[in-house]
């Protein structure tokens, strides 16, 4: 999720940048190769080569500014790739601590970062988290709401970065059976985990 220079700021979702460096050293030293979601979906690397036997995805959720200020320089140093799952409303609103579209564009130009959807605006609410149904919500209302949210996220990412969106990351790892047909229609790859 998030990165820091200050060990006192480490949480369940924030690691030190030196911790990321150790992780990247670990992967490199054991022969792992980072890939992007679109490469996973295609079953091959961009140059047409088959996926490496030790392919691995690095994923950073939410779109914190530290993905740009701290993680991107390390990705460049190691030649490592990562997927950054964006909550696009936070960027549109200029929420403090989150990426800006200018930063996203620079990350996209690096060729090392691919953006995934992490919803537009339905990340955490009182009656539902992520893409969960709201209490008493009909299936039709749910599908209309979630389709609009996900399509908005895809549109914002494509418009601002020029990247197609092939992946979705479930917020908080919360899945919803009603969402599956929509997700299958919109995305080639989905991720879950906390």
Locate the predicted segments by residue.
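Acidic, His- and aromatic-enriched active-site or binding-groove loops in soluble protein domains
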Residues: 60, 110, 187-194
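Short, electropositive alpha-helical surface patch
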Residues: 173-191
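N-terminal pre-catalytic segment of deacetylase/amide-hydrolase enzymes
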Residues: 1-55
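Conserved beta-strand segments of alpha/beta enzyme cores
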Residues: 33, 114, 188-189
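Metal-dependent polysaccharide deacetylase catalytic core of the NodB/CE4 family, i.e.
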Residues: 1-7, 53-56, 65, 70, ...
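Short, acidic/glycine-rich phosphate-metal binding loop used to engage nucleotide
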Residues: 40, 61-63
């Amino acid at each position: 999720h998030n990165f820091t220079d200050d060990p006192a700021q480490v949480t369940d979702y924030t690691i030190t940048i030196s911790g990321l460096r150790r992780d990247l050293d670990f992967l490199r030293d054991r022969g792992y190769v980072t890939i992007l979601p679109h490469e996973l979906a295609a079953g091959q690397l961009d140059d047409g080569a088959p996926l490496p036997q030790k392919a691995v995805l690095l994923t950073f959720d939410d779109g914190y500014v530290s993905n740009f200020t701290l993680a991107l320089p390390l990705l460049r140093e190691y030649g490592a790739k990562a997927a950054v799952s964006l909550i696009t409303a936070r960027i549109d609103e200029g929420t403090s601590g989150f990426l800006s579209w200018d930063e996203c564009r620079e990350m996209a130009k690096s060729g090392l970062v691919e953006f995934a959807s992490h919803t537009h605006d339905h990340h955490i609410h009182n009656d539902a988290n992520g893409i969960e149904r709201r209490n008493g919500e009909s299936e039709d209302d749910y599908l209309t709401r979630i389709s609009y949210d996900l399509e908005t996220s895809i549109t914002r990412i494509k418009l601002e970065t020029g990247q197609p969106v092939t992946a979705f990351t479930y917020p908080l790892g919360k899945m919803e059976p009603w969402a599956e047909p929509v997700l299958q229609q919109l995305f080639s790859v989905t991720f879950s985990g906390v």
